[in-house]
């Protein structure tokens, strides 16, 4: 595999290989979609790293996993790389199901250092001599979990090597004090000039790097005078850098020198997000996760959120918007442009975002916390303890709910209904269309008197923002019977309703806009007229909307057949949305088969 070949290559050959990999990644991602900018920035870093460390022996952990395409290419997946993010193909993230060289499955930011500590202690207890290397971005480093683990390194005598991939970005530009500190480290001209002169002098001596280490007090004094305390060194870690993340020869020398150090080290590497692809370099946020290039421009629910909140906030000065390093991903960059003083990007800090929103709400504001469904679960304690327990008026805009497609199991938003349903005071709204979405937002914000969650999909659609917003109005947040039939009743929540409406059977169809509370009046009417009720949700079936409906029907003493349709007890793989819905039996064809099964069973038995 390429992993062996790169160790024999000259630096000129490595540079050519880097350009070949850059070309391959660009071509495949522009076709399949994927994380382009972050991967173009880590090619040289990965090549240098794998010249020194071997993932077959050493635990190399890629935080978040969205910058590991070169890792995949080098570790035996070069021939399959064209399948990345396609149904049945390679995952867009690091996963142990795909390769034993993917030491730890990732997809959410900030987990790598804690995982590295776990591997390191396992190796130690088992008497295995292996290195542990973590590659983490400066954006992920701001997450609470990463900082918690960083704080433990010295305490448990770790020897971990942390490669800080600093490109000044997560998805949106990084914010906060740590981002400012890293900026100072990589840009201080006096320090960089002084360090360069000192290093040149030392390298001319016979004992070179060893002298530099012995004269560490001089280097530290230089840094201290210019920059103040180094954050990493204040935690008892050794800090090296910053280094050019695109200089393979330099990085290889650095990695060789620190490989066998017996103390925890941070190697600060500065890279260019989108390196080598001009469009991605100029707009790394746009190309962080690039859609297939041939996909026509459509409007997303995320963008619609931004436009809707901006419009409502013109009249309601109490509305504020909060996100966790996802200004563009959640559509809130649209709100930010019009209302910058009421927009807050707190970095990769979902827990902080929720509690921050709770306090805003408790003092008279109307906070909208916009976070992807898969990331909101990281702040569950704060949702329960800080928001719901105090009945704080917070609107959770749960983006990317349901099946998200190519990003796969780490990003599907299939658990939000299940983890929010049992929370007291929480209301859950699941619109079925863009028009219902904007009117639901308008209605909720007109009378936000407690915690409300509105969930909506990753899907895009054809539509004009202005025409949708012109029809925004206050609506009844209840259920509606859209059509009546005799064979069975189907209660669907969310945009999966559109698949239900395609079922060519004589069935009643109910649009359940509210997941919680249930619309008991409509439910009683349906129960009176039907002996088969089928619930459909694009979420986990166990403990979901259907279970909630079944419980209520049982309490009502209803004697019919209740069928809950949703995602079974499994982690859904990656692939196109249509392919996944078909596989899960949640497209119109699969739903039709399910409904027919129960209708036919009743006919055969003369009962349900």
UniProtKB/Swiss-Prot annotation:
GO terms for cellular component: cytosol. Binds 1 Mg(2+) ion per subunit. It catalyses: D-glyceraldehyde 3-phosphate + pyruvate + H(+) = 1-deoxy-D-xylulose 5-phosphate + CO2. Its cofactor is Mg(2+); thiamine diphosphate. Thiamine diphosphate binds at residues 66, 107-109, 139-140, 167, 277, 350. CDD domains: TPP_DXS (cd02007), TPP_PYR_DXS_TK_like (cd07033). The keyword NAD does not apply. Its EC number is 2.2.1.7. It is an enzyme of class 2 (transferase). It comes from the Bacteria. GO terms for molecular function: 1-deoxy-D-xylulose-5-phosphate synthase activity; magnesium ion binding; thiamine pyrophosphate binding. Mg(2+) binds at residues 138, 167. GO terms for biological process: 1-deoxy-D-xylulose 5-phosphate biosynthetic process; isopentenyl diphosphate biosynthetic process, methylerythritol 4-phosphate pathway; terpenoid biosynthetic process; thiamine biosynthetic process. Pathway: Metabolic intermediate biosynthesis; 1-deoxy-D-xylulose 5-phosphate biosynthesis; 1-deoxy-D-xylulose 5-phosphate from D-glyceraldehyde 3-phosphate and pyruvate: step 1/1. Keywords: Isoprene biosynthesis, Magnesium, Metal-binding, Thiamine biosynthesis, Thiamine pyrophosphate, Transferase. Homodimer. Belongs to the transketolase family. DXPS subfamily. Catalyzes the acyloin condensation reaction between C atoms 2 and 3 of pyruvate and glyceraldehyde 3-phosphate to yield 1-deoxy-D-xylulose-5-phosphate (DXP). HAMAP family: DXP_synth (MF_00315). This is 1-deoxy-D-xylulose-5-phosphate synthase. It comes from Thermotoga petrophila (strain ATCC BAA-488 / DSM 13995 / JCM 10881 / RKU-1).
């Amino acid at each position: 595999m390429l992993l062996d070949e790169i160790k024999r290559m000259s630096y000129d050959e490595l540079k050519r290989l880097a350009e070949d990999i850059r070309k391959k990644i660009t071509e495949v991602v522009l076709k399949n979609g994927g994380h382009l900018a972050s991967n173009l920035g880590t090619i040289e870093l990965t090549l240098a790293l794998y010249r020194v460390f071997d993932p077959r022996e050493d635990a190399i952990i890629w935080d978040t996993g969205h910058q590991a395409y070169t890792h995949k290419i080098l570790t035996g997946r070069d021939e399959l790389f064209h399948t990345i993010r396609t149904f049945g193909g390679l995952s867009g993230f690091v996963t142990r199901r795909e390769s034993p060289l993917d030491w730890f499955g990732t997809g959410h930011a900030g987990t790598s250092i804690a995982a590295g500590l776990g591997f390191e202690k396992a190796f130690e207890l088992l008497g295995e001599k292996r290195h542990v290397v973590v590659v983490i971005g400066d954006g992920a480093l701001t997450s609470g979990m990463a900082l918690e683990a960083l704080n433990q390194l010295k305490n448990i005598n770790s020897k971990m090597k942390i490669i800080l991939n600093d490109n000044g970005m997560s998805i949106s530009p990084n914010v906060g004090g740590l981002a400012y500190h890293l900026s100072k480290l990589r840009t201080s001209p006096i320090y960089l000039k002084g360090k360069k002169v000192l290093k040149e002098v030392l390298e001319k001596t016979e004992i070179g790097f060893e002298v530099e280490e012995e004269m560490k007090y001089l280097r530290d004094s230089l840094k201290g005078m210019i920059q103040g305390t180094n954050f990493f060194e204040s935690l008892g870690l050794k800090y090296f850098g910053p280094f050019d993340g695109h200089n393979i020869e330099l990085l290889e020398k650095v990695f060789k020198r620190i490989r066998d150090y017996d103390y925890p080290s941070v190697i600060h590497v500065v890279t260019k997000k989108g390196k080598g692809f001009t469009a991605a370099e100029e707009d790394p946020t746009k190309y962080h996760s690039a859609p297939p290039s041939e996909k026509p421009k459509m409007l997303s629910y995320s963008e619609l959120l931004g436009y809707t909140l901006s419009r409502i906030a013109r009249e309601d000065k109490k509305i504020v918007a909060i996100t966790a390093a996802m200004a563009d991903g959640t559509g809130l960059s649209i709100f930010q442009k019009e209302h910058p003083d009421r927009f807050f990007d707190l970095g990769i800090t979902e827990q902080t975002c929720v509690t921050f929103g709770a306090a805003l709400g408790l003092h008279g504001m109307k906070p909208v916390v916009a976070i992807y469904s898969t990331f909101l679960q990281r702040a569950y304690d704060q949702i329960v303890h800080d928001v719901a327990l105090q009945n704080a008026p917070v609107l959770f805009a749960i983006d990317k709910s349901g099946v998200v497609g190519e990003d796969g199991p780490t990003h599907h938003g299939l658990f939000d209904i299940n983890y929010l349903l049992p929370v007291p005071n929480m209301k859950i709204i699941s619109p079925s269309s863009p028009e219902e979405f904007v009117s639901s937002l308008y209605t909720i914000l007109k009378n936000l008197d407690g915690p409300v969650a509105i969930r909506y999909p990753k899907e895009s659609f054809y539509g004009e923002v202005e025409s949708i917003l012109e029809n925004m109005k206050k609506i009844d947040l209840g259920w509606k019977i859209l059509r009546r039939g005799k064979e069975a009743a189907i209660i669907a929540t969310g945009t999966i309703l559109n698949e239900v409406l395609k079922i060519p059977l004589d069935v009643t169809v109910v649009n359940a806009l509210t997941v919680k509370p249930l619309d008991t009046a409509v439910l009683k009417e349906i129960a009176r007229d039907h002996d088969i009720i089928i619930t459909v949700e694009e979420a986990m079936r166990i403990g979901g909307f259907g279970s909630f409906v079944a419980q209520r029907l049982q309490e009502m003493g209803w004697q019919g057949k209740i069928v809950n349709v949703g995602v079974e007890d499994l982690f859904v793989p990656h692939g196109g949305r249509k392919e996944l819905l078909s596989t899960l039996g949640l497209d119109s064809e699969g739903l039709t088969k399910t409904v027919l099964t129960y209708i036919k069973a009743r006919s055969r038995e003369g009962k349900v």
